[in-house]
Amino acid sequence: MADGDSGSERGGGGGGGGGPGGFQPAPRGGGGGGGGPGGEQETQELASKRLDIQNKRFYLDVKQNAKGRFLKIAEVGAGGSKSRLTLSMAVAAEFRDSLGDFIEHYAQLGPSSPEQLAAGAEEGGGPRRALKSEFLVRENRKYYLDLKENQRGRFLRIRQTVNRGGGGFGGGPGPGGLQSGQTIALPAQGLIEFRDALAKLIDDYGGDEDELAGGPGGGAGGPGGGLYGELPEGTSITVDSKRFFFDVGCNKYGVFLRVSEVKPSYRNAITVPFKAWGKFGGAFCRYADEMKEIQERQRDKLYERRGGGSGGGDESEGEEVDED
C-alpha cells in the first residue's frame, strides 16, 4: 500500500454524507463478514462503527465465530477498495494501549520544518523514516505500527502479516491460513477519535471473549464458567520512562498473565501461565526481601564509615554519669 494522502494513495473514499454513524449493533444471525471461504461458517457481526477521518472511511466491526470474538478494521479507499486488519479482542486491547502511546508522542511533536518538507518533496513525497515505531506479536500474526510523515501530513501506518499455519479468527484465505500483508494508514489527527471508538467496542464486547476462548463448557453456565466467566481487571504501573501493563486473559490452554513493558522506543511482553503465578510471585517477593536486607547492610556500613562509633562513646559516657 503506497503512502499518500496522510499515508495512503487509497485514502480517497467518499466522505460519507451521513457522517459517522455511531455504534450500530448488527443482527446476530449467521452470515457473512468473514474473509475467504471459511468466513461464512456461522460468523456473526455483533457491532459496527464507522469513522470519517479527513477524506477516508474506517469501519470497526466486532464479529464472532466458533474460534472466538474478533475485530475487523477496514479502510475504504478510492473506488471502494479496502484494506482490512483482523485482531482478536486481546490484541485489540493491546492495540488500544499502543494507540495511547502514539497519541502522547504525537502531541509532543512540533510542526515540521520547511527543510523537512523540502526533503520529503525531493524523495517524491514518500514517507520519511518513522517518527515512532512499535510492533505486536500474537499467535501467528504480527502487527507493525509506524508513525510517519509525508507532504500531506503525519499518519500511523499499521501493517499486519500472517504466517503460514492454522487460520486465524477471521478464517483467512489461502492454504493453512496464509495471507498477504495488509496495511491501513490512519491520519494522525484522527488517532484520538479512532482510539476512543476502539475502546468503546472493547468495553462493550470484549468482556465475554474469555468465555468464548475457553471453548465449549467455558461459558458462565458450563463447568468452567467460574474460571473463565470472571477474571481480574488489568492494571499498569509507571517506573521512570517505562510502563508495565498487567492483563489477565485465557485461551484454550488456560488462564495466563500477560506482562507488557512499554518504552517510547519499543514494546516487549511475556506471558505467564496461571500455574506459574505462585512461583513468579514467590521469586519476586524473595528477591525484594533479599534486596531490602542488602540495602540495609549497605546503609549500616555507610553509617559506620561516617563515624557511627563516636556516637557509641557518647552513650558510654552518659551511662557513667548516670551511675554516679
Swiss-Prot record:
Skewed-composition ranges (Basic and acidic residues): 297-307
Modification sites for N-acetylalanine: 2
Region listing for Disordered, in residue ranges: 1-47, 297-324
Keywords: Acetylation, Activator, DNA-binding, Methylation, Nucleus, Phosphoprotein, Repressor, Transcription, Transcription regulation
Gly residues: bias regions: 9-39
Omega-N-methylarginine PTM positions: 28, 164, 306
Result of knocking out the encoding gene: Liver-specific knockdown in db/db mice results in a decrease in fasting blood glucose and glucose levels in fed conditions. Mice show reduced glucagon sensitivity and hepatic gluconeogenesis, reduced CREB phosphorylation, reduced expression of PCK1 and G6PC and a significant down-regulation of ADCY6 expression.
UniProt biased composition (Acidic residues): 314-324
Localization terms from the record: Nucleus
Example of a GO MF term: RNA binding
GO cellular component, one term: nucleoplasm
Transmembrane region(s): none
Listed Pfam families: PurA
Thermal dependence of function as given in the entry: Thermostable.
PTM annotation (Phosphoserine): residues: 6, 8, 113, 310, 316
Induction line: By fasting or glucagon.
Outcome of swapping residue 159 to A: Reduced transcriptional repression of ACTA2 and MYOCD. No effect on homodimerization and thermal stability. Reduced ssDNA-binding and interaction with MSY1
Region DNA-binding, residue ranges: 37-263
Family of the protein in this entry: Belongs to the PUR DNA-binding protein family.
Subunit structure: Homodimer, heterodimer with PURA and heterotrimer with PURA and YBX1/Y-box protein 1. Interacts with MYOCD and SRF.
Protein role: Transcriptional regulator which can act as an activator or a repressor. Represses the transcription of ACTA2 in fibroblasts and smooth muscle cells via its ability to interact with the purine-rich strand of a MCAT-containing element in the 5' flanking region of the gene. Represses the transcription of MYOCD, capable of repressing all isoforms of MYOCD but the magnitude of the repressive effects is most notable for the SMC-specific isoforms.
Record's protein name: Transcriptional regulator protein Pur-beta
